[in-house]
Amino acid sequence: MLRLQLPVIAHTQGFLDSPIEAYHQALGLPQDLRPSFPRDQITIQYSRDDNTLIDITRNEKSIGDISAQLAWQKNISNKMAISYWGSIKLPTGDYKKLTGSGSTDIALWSAMDYRLKDTRWLYGQAGLLITRNNKVLNSIHRNWAAFVSTGIKFQPWNPIELKAQFEIHSALFDTDIKFLKDVLQFTFGGTYIINEKHKIDIAVAEDIYPGTSPDVNFNLSWYINF
């Protein structure tokens, strides 16, 4: 199976600050330093040795890094299947706008699906990302990162899949800054299967380890298999 990904990435001023604070307060989730910052603003800055390496204070939007993924699947039994994946990512984004890395990356991973019942599955994957000559904070960037995810999938109706999963990946940067360290997230959402070649994913990701990833991510993906 061949799959292509062409992301569109936008960094914009906040517009959900108040609802996000209310959501965390209602569920008793940690607010961290969120309430002490101005609302509905964007500031992404990084300085090292008195040199400013990243300084984004306005909205940015562009095509991200395009990637191609190739998979081979083996059915172990009528309940279990394992697939092996390889991916190459090309630097089509703009690293100065943080919509790309400026480097060509390779990733290898394996994935497993286990059927619990006709409409319920456990799934997981684990792999390794290899990157060289990354132009985003190149002096502290690591050449590899490991990633693992596991979750459960439920299909209440034929074209609809609901999912909940945990995701973790090791740090891509060699630094003591918390935001650039290992990441742990909880993601929930669903998939609408249009046909055998097309499907749409909608997901929301919440940071489990506060301060290492954005408070919340909204993801919309359209997959086309060839």
Predicted regions and their residues:
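Transmembrane beta-barrel domains of Gram-negative outer membranes and organellar outer membranes
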Residues: 1-132, 139-226
